[in-house]
Regions:
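Predominantly a Rossmann-like dinucleotide-binding segment in NAD(P)-dependent oxidoreductases
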Residues: 1-130, 258
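Catalytic cores of eukaryotic secretory-pathway lumenal/extracellular enzymes that build
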Residues: 23-28, 32, 221-222, 250, ...
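NAD(P)-dinucleotide binding in Rossmann-like oxidoreductases
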Residues: 72, 78-219
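C-terminal helix-rich "cap/oligomerization" subdomain common to oxidoreductases
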Residues: 150-151, 182, 187-188, 196-197, ...
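Residue-level signal for the nucleotide or nucleotide-sugar donor/cofactor binding architecture
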Residues: 48, 169, 236
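A general structural signal for well-ordered alpha-helical segments in protein cores
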Residues: 2, 53-54, 218-223, 248
C-alpha cells in the first residue's frame, strides 16, 4: 500500500500533493527494553523508526527538505523507578508493557523469548526484557516534526512509541490540489477522495504475504534485492539514506532547541 499511495500521489490522482501527514502512534515500548534504550547505541527512536518515516516523506515530496522543526521529547509515562525489578523476567507486578506478553509482541510472533541467550544475558544492552522504568534510558519517546520542502510542500510526522495496539496505529495521509488519500498500514487499505470530493473509492490489497513480518515487506525486500543482484538498477541510493538521517539529526536538534527550525543540509538554525 505504501508503493500504491506514492504512485497515486505522483500520477495526479489527487492533483498536486500539497501536504503530508504520517501518523505513527505505535506500541513500541520495546525500544526501552532492548539496546535501543541508549541514544549512543541506537540514535534514539526517532532514528530507529523515524528515519524510515522521513524516507517516506521525502519520497512523496520528491524535493529536498529545507527546514525541520520538532517538539516532544521524553514523556512522564516512563518516569524512572529505581525500586522496580530490572527486567520483566524478575518482576511480578501487573504491567501492560511486560515483554513477550504485549499484543504487539504476540502479533509479531515474539510471544516468547526467541533466543535463550537473552534470558542468560546480564549486561543491560544484551537483555531484551529490561524494565521500561529502569533508570538510564535517554531516548525520546514522542515527537511532532514539521518539514518544509523546496517545492513548497509541507509535511508532518506525528510519532509516539507508547501508542495502544490499534488498527490505525500507522497511517499516511496526502492532501493534493483536487483530493486526498489516506493509507492504513495495518489493513493495507487506501481511502481515496478525488475530483474535489465527487469521487471516492477504497483500494484494498489482498497480499498473500501480509501475515509475514512487516506485513510482507521483508519478503518483498528480499525479492527486490535479488532483482538488484540480477542487474536491475535501484531507484535510490546512498544519498537518499543520508538525506533521511540528516532529517533525524535536524529533528533531534530542534527538540533540544525548543522547536527552532533547523536546515537539515547544514544542521544550522533557519533564520
Amino acid at each position: 500500500p505504501w508503493v500504491e499511495a506514492a504512485r497515486l500521489a505522483h500520477t495526479g490522482a489527487i492533483g498536486d500533493p500539497q501536504m503530508v501527514l504520517l501518523r505513527s502512534v505505535i506500541p513500541y515500548t520495546r525500544y526501552l527494553q532492548l539496546w535501543h534504550r541508549d541514544n549512543a547505541r541506537s540514535g534514539g527512536a526517532l532514528n530507529d523508526k523515524g528515519s524510515h518515516h522521513f524516507d517516506v516523506l521525502n519520497w512523496i515530496a520528491d524535493a529536498p527538505a529545507v527546514s525541520v522543526s520538532a517538539v516532544g521529547g521524553r514523556s512522564s509515562i516512563f518516569t524512572p523507578d529505581p525500586d522496580a525489578p530490572a527486567r520483566c523476567s524478575e518482576c511480578d507486578r501487573t504491567c501492560p508493557y511486560r515483554r513477550h506478553e504485549t499484543l504487539v509482541d504476540r502479533f509479531e510472533g515474539v510471544g516468547r523469548v526467541a533466543n535463550p541467550s537473552w534470558s542468560r544475558a546480564r549486561d543491560i544492552e544484551h537483555r531484551n526484557d529490561n524494565c521500561v522504568y529502569l533508570p538510564g534510558s535517554d531516548i525520546d519517546d514522542h515527537a511532532v516534526v514539521s518539514v518544509r520542502y523546496a517545492n513548497g510542500m509541507s509535511a508532518c510526522l506525528f510519532f509516539a512509541i507508547f501508542g495502544p495496539w490499534a488498527e490505525d496505529q500507522e497511517t499516511l495521509e496526502i492532501v493534493g490540489s483536487t483530493g486526498r488519500l489516506r493509507m492504513e498500514r495495518h489493513s493495507g487499505e487506501i481511502d481515496l477522495v478525488a475530483d474535489h470530493g465527487h469521487r471516492r473509492e477504497t483500494i484494498c490489497f489482498q497480499d498473500p504475504d501480509r501475515g509475514s513480518t512487516h506485513f510482507g515487506a521483508d519478503l518483498q525486500l528480499v525479492r527486490t534485492l535479488r532483482r538488484f543482484y540480477g542487474g536491475e538498477k535501484p531507484p535510490v541510493g546512498v544519498a537518499e539514506g543520508v538525506a533521511s538521517l540528516r532529517m533525524v539529526l535536524a529533528a533531534q536538534k530542534s527538540l533540544r532547541e525548543n522547536g527552532q527550525p533547523i536546515n537539515p543540509q547544514t544542521l544550522e538554525a533557519v533564520r
